[in-house]
A protein has these predicted regions:
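Canonical radical SAM enzyme core domain
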Residues: 15-22, 88
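Short gly/pro-enriched beta-turn/loop segments at secondary-structure junctions
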Residues: 9-11, 38-39
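Radical SAM/AdoMet-radical enzyme domain recognition
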Residues: 1-10
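A generic short-segment signal for beta-strand/edge and adjacent turn/coil regions
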Residues: 12-15, 72
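Glycine-rich beta-alpha junction loops
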Residues: 14-17, 47-49
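Auxiliary Fe-S-binding modules of radical SAM enzymes
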Residues: 24-28, 34-201
């Protein structure tokens, strides 16, 4: 993804038999790749959960707190750290360095872990408030990778990827800039005022 200039989300799975050194080496490898290519948007620190495919035990809270803190310390500040709030106690981890709650939906299931429902919006708002994070819809591509005129004010652009003039392909840039209802909606979400925005009273 980095060599191709694609903004990318990656992560580590916690509780599959790895040790502390494995976790640290994985996080440092992600950092090194981002320093080389500038493409890592966020790192998901995901705990394993019991399901029909595995008998791994879910990591305890102290383990998750430590791994999240390791991720925040290892990664550059522009790379977000996230935990899936339907799999981890996000409210107990927000003080350890998470700054994104990931792709959640009040209207769909978690297709990867369907037995684990998304928290409701009020629950997510409480977690976001506890961490001082705004709770709002965002695009899959982080704001720093968006083109001029779409990227929100105050967000510095990521340096252009090697061998390309932009992070977003021309067809996607055209879609975002379109004058129709879909283009307007995408631009609204990019600014943080999309239709599913949840604001405090």
């Amino acid at each position: 993804a980095g060599r191709q200039g694609v903004p990318f989300t990656t992560g580590i799975l916690v509780g599959i038999g790895e040790g502390w050194r494995d976790r640290a080496e994985s996080l440092l490898a992600i950092r090194e790749l981002h320093e080389r290519h500038g493409h890592v948007q966020e790192v998901i620190v995901q705990n394993v959960v019991p399901n029909e495919r595995s008998d791994f035990a879910k990591p305890d809270l102290s383990t998750m707190r430590r791994v999240v803190a390791m991720a925040r310390a290892a990664l550059p500040p522009e790379v977000s750290v996230q935990v899936p709030p339907n799999l981890s106690p996000a409210a107990d981890l927000v003080g350890c360095g998470i700054d994104d709650l990931g792709g959640v939906s009040p209207v769909t299931d978690d297709y990867i872990n369907p037995a684990y429902e998304w928290p409701d919006l009020d629950g997510l708002r409480a977690v976001a408030d506890a961490g001082g994070m705004p709770l709002r819809e965002r695009l899959p591509t982080y704001a720093r990778y968006l083109p001029d005129g779409v990227r929100p004010a105050g967000v510095d652009p990521a340096p252009a990827p090697t061998g390309r003039d932009a992070w977003i392909p021309p067809a996607v840039r055209e879609r975002i800039r379109a004058g129709d209802v879909h283009g307007r909606r995408l631009r609204g979400v990019a600014r943080g005022d999309g239709p599913l925005a949840v604001r405090g009273d």
